[in-house]
């Protein structure tokens, strides 16, 4: 089963447009995922980059990003040398286990050390995804929409009561001034080992919470 480097954007947004503008997905910059461009130039000429120039029937056309000789792809990222009408996206195997890891900084004065350690976790591959870092206002605002929507749609709360209850809840679950959120992926053993290492490194700096699908299901059931 395959997946690709998605963003958190709405489903109506442009996949190619985001990558051409050097957008970022959950697993890193999306410019690295796009190759084999079909481009209409200002002269009306249609060019295909990489091995797509060999034709769509070639086994190399959609499977390898690098052709022979210089790569033209970079001309069309955040550029106006032509209009990209189609492209290939790099796919990746879906990992058998995925968990979210939330790190809540204990002392705001250690923010610099916190960011440095998060960067090391990413470089060493312990954190598989891009890690979001948010202050309290951002964290609570992000949670409020989901909580109020759930309370209204599934618990029959009025708009006012849903807002009141959600505000109480976010004060409990997101009280810290700075929080990060990232993901760990892999097989069961890899994920367990990564969580153990992250807890060991971060125990003095942050409170570590591991969020699984099962834990979310329990939370929704309780609500």
What are these regions (language model features)?
Residues 105-107, 112, 119-223:
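C-terminal substrate-recognition/cap domain of FAD-linked oxidoreductases
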């Amino acid at each position: 089963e395959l997946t690709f480097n998605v963003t958190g954007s709405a489903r109506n947004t442009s996949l190619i447009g985001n990558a051409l503008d050097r957008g970022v997905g959950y697993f890193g910059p999306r410019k690295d995922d796009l190759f084999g461009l079909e481009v209409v130039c200002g002269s009306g000429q249609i060019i295909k980059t990489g091995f797509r120039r060999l034709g769509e029937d070639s086994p190399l056309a959609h499977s390898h990003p690098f052709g022979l000789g210089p790569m033209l792809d970079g001309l069309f990222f955040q550029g106006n040398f032509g209009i990209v009408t189609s492209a290939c996206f790099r796919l990746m195997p879906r990992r058998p286990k995925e968990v979210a890891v939330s790190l809540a900084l204990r002392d705001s004065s250690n923010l610099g050390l916190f960011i440095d350690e998060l960067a090391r976790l990413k470089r060493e591959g312990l954190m598989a995804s891009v890690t979001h870092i948010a202050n309290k206002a951002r964290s609570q605002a992000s949670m409020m929409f989901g909580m109020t929507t759930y309370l209204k749609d599934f618990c029959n709360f009025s708009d006012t009561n849903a807002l009141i209850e959600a505000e109480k809840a976010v004060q409990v679950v997101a009280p810290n001034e700075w929080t990060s959120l990232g993901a760990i992926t892999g097989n069961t053993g890899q994920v367990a080992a990564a969580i153990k290492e992250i807890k060991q490194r971060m125990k003095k700096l942050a409170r570590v919470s591991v969020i699984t699908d099962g834990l979310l299901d329990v939370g929704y059931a309780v609500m």
